C-alpha cells in the first residue's frame, strides 16, 4: 500500500497477438514483422516442400519453401500453433503430411498443422473444418 501511495507502478501491461495471417508472402515477413513472430496462432503459406523448386526460386516468386521454415525455425519459437497453407497443387494432402513429418524439426512439428488446398467449388481431397484449428490451439495451450 505504501508503494502505491508513492505513485510507483506495480503492474505492467503485455499485449500478445492471438492471430496473425500475413498472406501470400516470403519468409522475410517473419524476419521483419514482430507481430507474426509473437502471434499465438500463425497462419502462413508454405508453397514448396521439395527440390523441384529451389528456395531461391520460391522467394523470387513471392513464396515460402520448407527450407526457409527449417533454416529460420527460431523465428517461430513464440508461436503456439502454426497452420501451414497455400501449398502448390502438385502436393496431395497425404504427401504434405508425410513431408512435414519427415522434414520439420522437433521444435516445430508438435505445434504445426496444415490446411490442404481446396478447389473453386469448395471441395477438398481432405476436408478440414477450420473451427478445429481453434480447438487444437485451445487443447495445446492447456
Identify the function of each model-found stretch.
Residues 1-84, 94-103, 124-142:
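Metal-dependent phosphodiesterase/nuclease catalytic metal-binding core
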